[in-house]
Amino acid sequence: MINGVLQIDKPKAESSASYIRRLSKLEPELKIGHCGTLDPMATGILVVCLNQMTRFASYLSSSEKTYQACIYFGKKTSTGDSEGEIIDSKEFSFLDFSSKDVENTIQKFLGKSKQKPPA
């Protein structure tokens, strides 16, 4: 019996669930739990617990996480993310902003927040 924690580097355009299904097909008797879902458009580490280690999945899920993002200024999309159609764009120059302006804006995105999906 295999017990352990896998760290899978999930590529863009593939769902977390597809990896779980693939593991289940490889070993049907394997008990599998994952520690959070990544959006299909996201890349990153998908943490998967196997057999006896599944009891630690909730502990690992509640651990602190870090995210890295790429921000595109001056573009508005139909979905509010990089996957949508660009519905508005404006010329943008960092010369229009001081480093303090950028720092103050970044601070607004730190900590817990609730996201409002586009209407």
Regions from the language model: what does each represent?
Residues 1-119:
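Catalytic/RNA-binding core of pseudouridine synthases
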